[in-house]
Amino acid sequence: EQYDADSLRYYLSINMPETHDTDFRWDEYVDRVNNELIGTYGNFVHRVMTLTHRLECDEGNPLSKYDGFSDHSKILREVDNQISNAIESMEKQRFKEALRSIMGIAQIGNSLLQEAAPWKFINEDESDERSTSLSSLSLSWRICSCLAVCMRPFTPFSSDRLWGMLGNQNDIDNVLWEDSMDVGTNL
């Protein structure tokens, strides 16, 4: 009752014995949950949601006008590569490996946000620099959608909550991992 089921599922998945025995250690559980699940995944999602909420918009998603403004083909290839690696790992029942690839997507998102620094442009007038930065935030929104879908086997309750916070009405279970960047993003 003291710990969220998803954090326990995450720890058990990332620490599960695939080739050798393993022990459950509370200190390692706390460390992995704080540094990986919260520090990488949770921090990225929180930043995207908070920054998007701070944008003024009359109706709909405030990021929709920035979607595709900048060329993010390199980032998209990196994310697609991580998704492909995760799918391949899941098919081979290498769940830890799959989870590492998915967490790699969150790391890509964090790097994208850090480089774009959209918090600097939230209250600025329209400019190419602002649009470029907010285009990265828009892509980060898509990455959150991808993470909700791909993390579903490991953190189902959190994934459902994130899917809903992103404004998605369709069933998350009907979205293929390889389509998760483009489906249900409400941009």
Give, region by region, the residue ranges found by the protein language model.
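Catalytic adenosine-cofactor/nucleotide-binding cores of aminoacyl-tRNA synthetases and other
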Residues: E1-G68, Q169-N186
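Conserved, charged catalytic cores of large soluble enzymes
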Residues: V45-A86, A106-S133
